Amino acid sequence: MSRIHYELANVESPFAWRSKFALAHKGLAYESRRTAFTDIPTICEGRHKTVPVLVDEDGTETCESMAIASYLDEKYESATPLLGGGRQARTEEIEGLLGPHGFQAFFPLYILDIHNGLPEKDAAYFRESREKRFGATLEELSNNRDERLPAAREGLQPLRDALGDKQWYDGDNPGYTDCVVLAFFAFIKGCAKTPPLAAGDPLLGYIERGFALYDDLGNSIQGGPLA
């Protein structure tokens, strides 16, 4: 059987993109199967409640991006490692920055854009589940985006500082930490109707290098400009 990667349809998932970058890092081909939010319970006969899900050529099923990265390192150890050599600690460190300074700052600003790009059935599910999670309407969450964007951009400074003058977050060569960061910007690029970054942001050079990896994988995303 072919290797299958289940990911969301109609919206770019940051967690699916982590796995897509990880698979490309390992040089592994796969079939992408895009699945609607409301169809996730049908994946693998209901054995998984979220995506991404990787079904390997031998039928092994792995769910969630970090578990997939660990599985790939264990199964394909001869290929370039994702998490070895202390990289897992580095990934956890950067994830600790990306949560409050990335997802929590930017996701609410673009949450209505995501909703508006979904088909009716998924849009209803997305609205109900996200409004319950955040305790506010999507309109309230994304209100005054233009006025709030400068603070969100400024809040990325810890990520800029962590990169410094290095080419990659994992050092001389990209690793899973870079998959995580690039996946966040892949997600934002795919959903943002207003550029999330300002022109001249030092992160733009890093993103350009990262999106060019693996035969321009990141540049395959359909979306607006990042700045």
Explain the meaning of each model-derived region.
Residues 216-217:
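NAD(P)-dependent Rossmann-like dehydrogenase/reductase catalytic/cofactor-binding core
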